[in-house]
UniProtKB/Swiss-Prot annotation:
Function: Probable catalytic subunit of a protein translocase for flagellum-specific export, or a proton translocase involved in local circuits at the flagellum. May be involved in a specialized protein export pathway that proceeds without signal peptide cleavage.
Ligand binding (ATP): 182-189
Family from the record: Belongs to the ATPase alpha/beta chains family.
Catalytic activity: ATP + H2O + 4 H(+)(in) = ADP + phosphate + 5 H(+)(out)
Keywords: ATP synthesis, ATP-binding, Bacterial flagellum biogenesis, Bacterial flagellum protein export, Cytoplasm, Hydrogen ion transport, Ion transport, Nucleotide-binding, Protein transport, Translocase, Transport
CDD domains: ATP-synt_flagellum-secretory_path_III_C, ATP-synt_flagellum-secretory_path_III_N, ATPase_flagellum-secretory_path_III
Enzyme class (EC, first level): translocase
Protein name per its UniProtKB record: Flagellum-specific ATP synthase
Domain of life: Bacteria
Length: 457
């Protein structure tokens, strides 16, 4: 009897403690309008980014639909749901989520830490791999304050990507932010998988944003592989989820990378794709009434891109780093697409994949002439730079005169540079190609370049 009474009193104490944490009054609003992607509610005063739940009737049961405040007009809140809203009725109750005992809303907290390694999560931190939720007590806010640029460590160390053309001809530094510009079907995902497997980094964070669901599974199981997945965290927000969840997925992947950087680790962040992130913001902005600008993209899109990209890079002196590769989809291989143009301006370099090379069976289909690494000159030696310059000159000379050479219209001796390019062309072309399962480290990449050009002037 005494044991039962003690247990009952303990349960009562726990219940009272939980009750004390609840706000005295739970306020709610009402749903007044649903137009396209946006729901309107009245009766609540909440800040931008606040999380709400909307009651949805399913027969005799009541379910909750999570949403976020994306705008307001007077007393009306504009809500963007994170899931399907079918079945929501006019006048449905809308509650604020994460309300403290004082009646204030706490910010959204998502799981962080080493327990995330090897896991596949969605943009809200929920598992997609069929395993339980990550066993971690570490959480963090989705958005962090801007990094003081004067406290960043300069880009001083070479990052070995394991891909020969990138290592030697487009050298990337640790903490650099690169764009991978490509149309559809030119080997973009395969190249990302090679970098994920072969890059010398402590942790890899992959954000698959707005891609087809089939491609997400294929990338994780076949392209990333067991070797890459063991040291990776994958955040997947495919094309069929809410645009808000797609944007949150990109921000969450970046936040995880920041967390590992703050722990002193060197992180490789792969974001596929930055264009889908911009398209998600376009959907949200147009839905709440923001006027379109260039090619239908509202001005807020071009403000969101640098805000996301600037979070990557080196940390403070002696700390970790985030080297980021963002894929940018070029519609019809148009390099002047507004998102491609904006990304080119805010990134530290770009790697362009060529459809012509891909159709010719040349992989990776990197267009060396159209690509550049802005940090390269500060990372390589004078001899290395001279070899790269000679390589590009010969490559450009051959490409300009390819048709003349092919039909036999070129007379040998007319152009010494072209003569040398023709003689070395098999070696140049072979150097630019690499098998999917072949790893070319930094030292081997330089040695291959030296074999083509033993002496440089």
């Amino acid at each position: 009897m005494t044991t039962r009474l003690t247990r009952w009193l303990t349960t009562l104490d726990n219940f009272e403690a939980k009750m004390a944490q609840l706000p005295a009054v739970r306020r709610y609003g009402r749903l007044t309008r649903a137009t396209g992607l946006v729901l309107e509610a009245t009766g609540l005063q909440l800040p931008l980014g606040a999380t709400c739940v909307i009651e949805r009737q399913n027969g005799s049961e009541t379910h909750e639909v999570e949403s976020e405040v994306v705008g307001f007009n007077g007393q009306r809140l504009f809500l963007m749901p994170l899931e399907e809203v079918e079945g929501v009725l006019p006048g449905a109750r809308v509650y604020a989520k994460n309300i403290s005992a004082e009646g204030l809303q706490s910010g959204k907290q998502l799981p962080l830490g080493p327990a995330l390694l090897g896991r596949v999560l969605d943009g809200s931190g929920k598992p997609l791999d069929g395993l339980p939720s990550p066993d971690t007590t570490e959480t963090g806010a989705l958005i962090t304050p801007p990094f003081n640029p004067l406290q960043r460590t300069p880009i001083e160390h070479v990052l070995d990507t394991g891909v020969r053309p990138i290592n030697a001809l487009l050298t990337v530094g640790r903490g650099q932010r690169m764009g991978l510009f490509a149309g559809s079907g030119v080997g973009k995902s395969v190249l990302l998988g090679m970098m994920a497997r072969y890059t010398r980094a402590d942790v890899i964070v992959v954000g698959l944003i707005g891609e087809r669901g089939r491609e997400v599974k294929d990338f994780i199981e076949n392209i990333l592989g067991a070797e890459g997945r063991a040291r990776s965290v994958v955040i997947a927000a495919p094309a069929d989820v809410s645009p808000l969840l797609r944007m949150q997925g990109a921000a969450y992947a970046t936040r995880i990378a920041e967390d590992f950087r703050d722990r002193g680790q060197h992180v490789l962040l792969i974001m596929d794709s930055l264009t889908r992130y911009a398209m998600a913001q376009r959907e949200i902005a147009l839905a709440i009434g923001e006027p379109p600008a260039t090619k239908g993209y509202p001005p807020s899109v071009f403000a969101k891109l640098p805000a996301l990209v600037e979070r990557a890079g080196n940390g403070i002196s002696g700390g970790g780093s985030i080297t980021a590769f963002y894929t940018v989809l070029t519609e019809g291989d148009d390099q002047q697409d507004p998102i491609a143009d904006s990304a080119r301006a805010i990134l530290d370099g770009h790697i362009v994949l060529s459809r012509r090379l891909a159709e010719a069976g040349h992989y990776p289909a990197i267009d060396i002439e159209a690509s550049i690494s802005r940090a390269m000159t500060a990372l390589i030696s004078e001899q290395h730079y001279a070899r790269v310059r000679t390589f590009k000159q010969l490559l450009s000379s051959f490409q300009r005169n390819r048709d003349l050479v092919s039909v036999g219209a070129y007379a040998k001796g007319s152009d010494p540079m072209l003569d040398k390019a023709i003689a070395l062309w098999p070696q140049l072309e072979g150097y630019l190609q690499q098998g999917i399962f072949e790893r070319a480290d930094w030292e081997a990449s330089l040695q291959g370049l030296e074999r083509i050009f033993p002496t440089v002037s």
